[in-house]
C-alpha cells in the first residue's frame, strides 16, 4: 500500500510539473532525443507542441484587476493617465 501511495504521489507531482511548465518536459525529451531527434519538429523552438510561452512571466496579469479600487478611484486614474 505504501508503494502504491508513493507511486501515485510521484506521478501526481510529475503531472503537475508537466502541466505548469512546457520547458521541463520539452528540455528533457530534447536532451534525450538529441538535436535532430524523432520529435525535433514538435519540441524545437518553432515546435507545435512545446514552446517558450510558459517561460514568460505571466504574474503581471494579477495586478490588472484590483477589486479594492472604487469607481471614483478608476475615474481619477483614467483622468490622470489620459495624457500620459
Curated annotation (Swiss-Prot):
It is found in: Secreted; Target cell membrane. This is Peptide Ctry2346. GO terms for biological process: regulation of defense response to virus. It comes from Chaerilus tryznai. The modification Leucine amide is found at residue 33. Shows a low ability to inhibit hepatitis C virus (HCV) infection in Huh7.5.1 cells. Antimicrobial peptide. Expressed by the venom gland.
Amino acid at each position: 500500500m505504501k508503494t502504491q501511495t508513493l507511486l501515485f504521489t510521484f506521478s501526481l507531482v510529475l503531472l503537475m510539473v508537466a502541466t505548469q511548465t512546457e520547458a521541463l518536459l520539452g528540455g528533457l525529451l530534447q536532451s534525450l532525443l538529441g538535436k535532430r531527434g524523432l520529435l525535433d519538429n514538435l519540441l524545437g523552438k518553432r515546435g507545435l507542441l512545446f514552446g517558450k510561452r510558459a517561460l514568460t512571466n505571466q504574474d503581471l496579469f494579477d495586478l490588472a484587476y484590483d477589486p479594492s479600487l472604487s469607481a471614483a478611484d478608476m475615474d481619477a486614474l483614467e483622468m490622470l493617465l489620459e495624457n500620459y
